[in-house]
Structures are given as structure tokens and as C-alpha cells.
Curated annotation (Swiss-Prot):
The gene is dnaN. Forms a ring-shaped head-to-tail homodimer around DNA which binds and tethers DNA polymerases and other proteins to the DNA. The DNA replisome complex has a single clamp-loading complex (3 tau and 1 each of delta, delta', psi and chi subunits) which binds 3 Pol III cores (1 core on the leading strand and 2 on the lagging strand) each with a beta sliding clamp dimer. Additional proteins in the replisome are other copies of gamma, psi and chi, Ssb, DNA helicase and RNA primase. It is found in: Cytoplasm. This is Beta sliding clamp. Belongs to the beta sliding clamp family.
Length: 377
């Protein structure tokens, strides 16, 4: 038996976050449900697809406001999406849930009444246990940044599963996050304080994307704990657990060429918008290819679509070292890389027409984007 009354709006927000861990395609039918556990002083919501698990604790009061009133402790598993849709459409400000011994759950709000068939919570798989020792603490703002600057470059193809994740390497009080789909590479470096243990793990890109949606900007810090095959992110009232990917992440340091032939400094916004315009035709051509040529403090971008026509853009460079060069690249990769550099000025280093080139914020080595060119010349 379980019975509690809860503020509907607050409940919806927490349920929506819990749903992010639930997949309709699961081998265990019970995992399409949300586990609700009413304890003496809190209600705990759990969602999982066995890769990602989200556990949210709802306290009795938040900022001095009463949120939930628990009359009887107990637990039940309710069909996830149905249940959340019902709660969203209920008329009242409060919702009351009560269950019987068969886990039939009565949901009432205003003049509405729903009866749902619940499942036995004892059948719900136990969440992975992650020890709470040795936390790494980051600010939410920094972690959101790290995800935005690397996660877009993970591979979407399952042929090399390790590349669908971001490699987190912790050594000598530095965190190095690397993502690559073998056509481009994103690296973000970050100084940490007093980290005793070195780590080398691969966190699934999908998990980081979901975590990013849940972290609210008003939370300040997030604690990160690692187990042998799991990682736990603890932020506010949310525990977010993800399975780590197995396997060895390739050594990407050797991809970075040594001495550049040409280095230029350019306005990020102008460069981005010029590529964006040129890509209108590149996309029509079906291959997203844009040609770039450098010379005399000007960068020229061009693209051709046989059916539609041609485009030419010129962007002034602030600083050019070296001679002239022609190179072709995928416009989407370039725009993603520029978006990940939150600096007004970008440095681009070219090493030759068929060698990878590098983008980074001017005067800052903490973010590096590497892109492989396309052979057209």
C-alpha cells in the first residue's frame, strides 16, 4: 500500500527528467515503467533502460514550500509514458496516488480519476552500485561546456562502438575529453584540483546528451563518481548513472601534425556565417563540400551545385602566416567545430592540402578541433 499527494507541476518536471532514461525498445518490459518509491520523508522516482538510469529524489519541501504529503509508504512501477501523459493532463494543482496490494493505482486530481495497473516493484532491476568515494567536482556550467565542445563529434555508427563515446582521461590533475568519428576530432582539456586517482574511461555520447538536458543552470556543482563499468553524476536531487563503454579508445595524439604551413586568425562569427551561406549550395550538391583558399589576408570560400549554380564568399583574416593553400572540407564539420569554440577569434592551422587542419580559440589551448579534409584538388 502506498499513498501520497503531490504538487502536480513539480511532479511533471521530475517525471519528465526520469522519462529521459526510459526507452520504448527494451528487452525487459518492466523497464518501460517508472518506479515510484514513497518513503517516510521523500518520494524516489527511477527510470532506466539498463544503459542509463536516472533516480530523482523528491523531498517533502522545496524552498519552504510543501511539495509532497506522504500518508503511507510503499512502491509501485507504473507504465512510464502513459502515466506521465495522464499527470500532465490532470485538472487540479495536486495529484493523489494510492495503491492496493495488487499494485492497482488510483490517481485522482480535481474531478478526474484514473485507475492504472501497476507492476510489482520487486521485479524492477536493482540499480548499479557506484561507490561514493573519490568524487570529481565540476561546476554545472563547465560540464555543460565540456559536453557542448566534444559530444557532437562522437560517431553515430556502431561499427566501432568505442567511438560512440567520449574518452575521459584523468591524469596529473588534468581531465582530457576526446571525441572522434574518424573524420573529425574534438578535444577539451581542463585542470582539476587534488584528484588522487588516474582514470581512463569512455562515456557513451547518448548518456552525456541526456545528462546535458537534465542539468539545470541554477544548480552549481556536480559530483562525478566512477566504478569499474559505471559512472554516476550527482547533481541536486538527481542521480544519473551510465554504463561505460568497454574497449580501448584509440590514441589520437599522433593525429596532430607538428609544424603548420599556414596559420590564420579569423573572426569566428563572420567565418561561421560565410560557411553557412556557402553550405546552402554544398548541401544541394549532396556532399557538403566547400573549397577554401588562402592568400593576402583573405580567405575565399566557394561551392558548386551542378543543377543550381555557384557561390563565392570572402572573409578577411586578421593575421596570416605562411603562403597560400587550397583545401576542401565538409561544411557541417567546420560549422560544428566553430560552434564549439566560444571565442570571438579563431586560429586555424593548415599543414597541407591533404593533411588534417586544426581550429582553436585564439591564445587558448584548452579546446582543439581537428578536421580531415576532402580530396577535391
Amino acid at each position: 500500500m502506498m499513498e501520497f499527494t503531490i504538487k502536480r507541476d513539480y511532479f511533471i518536471t521530475q517525471l519528465n527528467d526520469t522519462l529521459k532514461a526510459i526507452s520504448p525498445r527494451t528487452t525487459l518490459p518492466i523497464l518501460t515503467g517508472i518506479k515510484i518509491d514513497a518513503k517516510e520523508h521523500e518520494v524516489i522516482l527511477t527510470g532506466s533502460d539498463s544503459e542509463i538510469s536516472i533516480e530523482i529524489t523528491i523531498p517533502k519541501t522545496v524552498d519552504g514550500e510543501d511539495i509532497v504529503n506522504i500518508s503511507e509508504t510503499g512502491s509501485v512501477v507504473l507504465p512510464g509514458r502513459f502515466f506521465v501523459d495522464i499527470i500532465k493532463k490532470l485538472p487540479g494543482k495536486d495529484v493523489k496516488l494510492s495503491t492496493n496490494e495488487q499494485f492497482q493505482t488510483l490517481i485522482t486530481s480535481g474531478h478526474s480519476e484514473f485507475n492504472l495497473s501497476g507492476l510489482d516493484p520487486d521485479q524492477y532491476p536493482l540499480l548499479p552500485q557506484v561507490s561514493r568515494d573519490d568524487a570529481i567536482q565540476l561546476s554545472v556550467k563547465v560540464l555543460k561546456n565540456v559536453i557542448a565542445q566534444t559530444n557532437f563529434a562522437v560517431s553515430t555508427s556502431e561499427t566501432r562502438p568505442v567511438l560512440t563515446g567520449v574518452n575521459w582521461l584523468i591524469q596529473e590533475n588534468e581531465l582530457i575529453c576526446t571525441a572522434t568519428d574518424s573524420h573529425r576530432l574534438a578535444v577539451r582539456k581542463l585542470q582539476l584540483e587534488d584528484v588522487s586517482e588516474n582514470k581512463n574511461v569512455i562515456i557513451p555520447g547518448k548518456a552525456l546528451a541526456e545528462l546535458n538536458k537534465i542539468m539545470s543552470d541554477n544548480e552549481e556543482d556536480i559530483d562525478i563518481f566512477f566504478a569499474s563499468n559505471q559512472v554516476l553524476f550527482k547533481v541536486g536531487n538527481v542521480n544519473f548513472i551510465s554504463r561505460l563503454l568497454e574497449g580501448h579508445y584509440p590514441d589520437t595524439t599522433r593525429l596532430f601534425p607538428e609544424n603548420y604551413e599556414i596559420k590564420l586568425s579569423i573572426d569566428n562569427g563572420e567565418f561561421y556565417h560565410a560557411i553557412d551561406r556557402a553550405s546552402l549550395l554544398a548541401r544541394e550538391g549532396g556532399n557538403n563540400v566547400i573549397k577554401l583558399s588562402t592568400g593576402d589576408d583573405v580567405v575565399e570560400l566557394s561551392s558548386t551545385s551542378p543543377e543550381i549554380g555557384t557561390v563565392k564568399e570572402e572573409v578577411d583574416a586578421n593575421d596570416v602566416e605562411g603562403g597560400s593553400l587550397k583545401i576542401s572540407f565538409n561544411s557541417k564539420y567546420m560549422m560544428d567545430a566553430l560552434k564549439a569554440i566560444d571565442n570571438d577569434e579563431v586560429e586555424v592551422e593548415f599543414f597541407g592540402t591533404m593533411k588534417p587542419f586544426i581550429l582553436k580559440p585564439k591564445g587558448d589551448d584548452s579546446v582543439t578541433q581537428l578536421i580531415l579534409p576532402i580530396r577535391t584538388y
